[in-house]
Amino acid sequence: MFWSVCVVLLAYLLGSLSFAVIVSRAMRLDDPRSYGSGNPGATNVLRSGNKVAAILTLLLDAVKGVVAVLIARFLAERLGYGDGVVALAGLAAFLGHLYPIFFRFQGGKGVATAAGVLLALNWMVGLACLGAWLLVAVLTRYSSLAALVTALLAPVLFHFMHGDSPVVGAVAVMSALLIWRHRSNITKLLNGTESKLGSKARKA
C-alpha cells in the first residue's frame, strides 16, 4: 500500500511540471498564460509564433505521461501490485497537469499528457486516438474539437480492448475531465468564435 501511494504521488508530481511555462521561460518567451486562450499548453504556445517552443512543450507534456505510467508498470512487476495502481498513476499524471502543485494548481487542459498516458497504457489504442485527433485537426483546424472527439472515442476503444479493467475507468475519468476543461471551447465552437490552429496570439 505504501509503495502504491508513493508511485501515484510521484506520477502527480511529474504531471505537475508545466512545460508550457518552463519552456517559455527557458526560451525567454511571454508566459503562455498571458496571451491567446491563457492555457499553458502546446497549442497556445504555438500562438506565440515560436514553433520550436510549441513542439518541445507538446513532446515534454506527452513524455511525462508516458514516464509516469512506465515507472508505475516497472514497479508493479517487481512489487506485485496490479493494473489498478498503474491506471491510477496515469490518471495522477493527468491531474498533475490540470492542477499542478508547482504552479498554484493552475494548469492546462491535458491533451498532450493524456495522449502520453494513453500510449503508455496501450500503444495501439493510443496511436488510434492520436490518429483520430490528427484527422479532425487537419480537416477542421480546430485543436479543441479534435481533443473533444478523441476524448469521446478513447474510453470506447479502451473498453473494447480491456473490458472491465481499471484502466478503462481511469481513461473514462480523464476523458470526462478533458471535456470539462474544454467547456469554454465548446461554447466558442457553437458560437463560431473558436480560434483555429495557426491563429496569432492575443493578450489574455
Feature roles, as predicted:
Residues 2-28:
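N-terminal signal-anchor transmembrane alpha helix
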Residues 5-10, 54-55, 86-91, 115, ...:
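Hydrophobic alpha-helical transmembrane segments
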Residues 46-50, 72-76, 92, 96, ...:
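Interfacial segments of multi-pass membrane proteins
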